[in-house]
């Protein structure tokens, strides 16, 4: 029987020592309510911007490995990106990814929201668990795949935008400081919430 589930895109290259970083982090947590993710290196975006090619044919593996120690990032808060690791019991409890997000747009934040509702507060991107991502070759850049309107599906399902969820709940793109707390309901929160509700009203008529 296996205890952990690692979800990855099929256009990702796992950098050395990723498994040890993940194993050590899981040992430190000592419970099953967590969502641990890697740090993406991409040609034009990602957590770390570094060009080693946009396809497997162009991939300069040696360049990546020779410079990996220079590609720095802190452990980061609220990551919702692949690759990620969760306990298999937690995956089963929330029924994994939701089918209405097929073929995948916004499926990650939806999964995170289901985990949040289940009481998960550790959403941690690991600085030393690095992958090189060639950039959505399976879905977004594939002309044969019809894209789902995942952001609208998320909005209708949860009543807020993915951006609102990532900003006020997951605190995405900030340095990891520990388990997350409930959103701070200040002026910015309510202003952004109002924008979410206005957008919800709009997409409801589409």
Label the model's feature ranges.
Residues 36-53:
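Short beta-strand-to-loop element that shapes/binds the nucleotide-sugar donor at the catalytic cleft/hinge
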Residues 128, 141-168:
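Catalytic core of nucleotide-sugar-dependent glycosyltransferases
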Residues 12-25:
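Acidic donor-binding/catalytic loop of UDP-sugar-dependent glycosyltransferases
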Residues 145-149, 164-206:
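Non-catalytic, C-terminal membrane-associated alpha-helical segments of glycosyltransferases
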Residues 41, 102, 124-144, 153:
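Active-site donor/metal-binding and catalytic loop motifs
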Residues 65-89:
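A recurrent flexible, glycine/aromatic-enriched loop bordering the glycosyltransferase active site
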Residues 77-83, 92-125, 129-132:
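Donor nucleotide-sugar recognition loop
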Residues 2-13:
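Short beta-strand-to-loop acidic/aromatic patch adjacent to the donor-nucleotide binding site
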């Amino acid at each position: 029987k296996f205890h952990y589930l690692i979800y990855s895109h099929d256009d990702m290259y796992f950098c050395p020592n990723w498994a040890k970083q993940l194993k050590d982090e899981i040992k430190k947590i000592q419970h099953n309510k967590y969502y641990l993710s890697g740090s993406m290196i991409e040609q034009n975006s990602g957590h770390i911007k570094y060009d080693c090619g946009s396809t497997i044919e162009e991939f300069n593996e040696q360049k990546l490995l020779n410079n990996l120690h220079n590609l720095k990032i802190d452990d980061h808060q609220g990551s919702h990106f692949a690759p990620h690791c969760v306990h298999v019991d937690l995956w089963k409890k929330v029924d994994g990814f939701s089918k209405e997000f097929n073929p995948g747009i916004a499926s990650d934040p939806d999964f995170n929201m289901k985990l949040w509702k289940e009481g998960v507060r550790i959403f941690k991107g690991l600085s030393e668990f690095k992958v090189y991502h060639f950039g959505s070759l399976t879905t977004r850049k594939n002309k044969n795949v019809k894209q789902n309107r995942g952001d609208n599906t998320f909005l209708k399902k949860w009543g807020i935008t993915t951006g609102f969820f990532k900003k006020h709940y997951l605190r995405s793109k900030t340095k990891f400081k520990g388990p997350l707390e409930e959103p701070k309901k200040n002026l910015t929160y309510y202003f952004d919430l109002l924008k979410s509700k206005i957008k919800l009203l709009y997409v409801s008529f589409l």
